[in-house]
């Protein structure tokens, strides 16, 4: 049917009467909000001299995130893309978008594996939309020291349990509560014996 992954709606109502003034799609609004959140976080959490950005899942969410990242991470000069394959239509479309909109980016690499996409990245932005069976396993050793990971999609959160260390940052505790149950069920410390700390 060529439908988007989610179909969202918003109603604009008269502030005095409550009468609806517009009922319309909220997909773009949701994508921009979802993309803006990690970029706002990157402003405070990512290295100020970040030069390599990795977009895992080059669809609409990471496209919106990219536009926001480029506002707060002005030194980005290389972008790595990981789609479903090196011939992914969304990855190729994202590459063209970057070439047209961000001429300051000197290199754009479409990666064949998740590992390749994560290695040497200062910021990893994940917004995959895949089934659990098709998720690639994520490993700590792929990340460089000081890298920041933003996950908005389908990373298996238990895969982060051994290396996130002491802190996870979320924008809405209730929204992520089910995801965090994976950690809470394993106790208050990670595999290294570090106490988990949640920042909201």
PLM region spans:
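Short internal alpha-helix immediately C-terminal to a glycine-rich phosphate-binding loop
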Residues: 33-54, 60-72
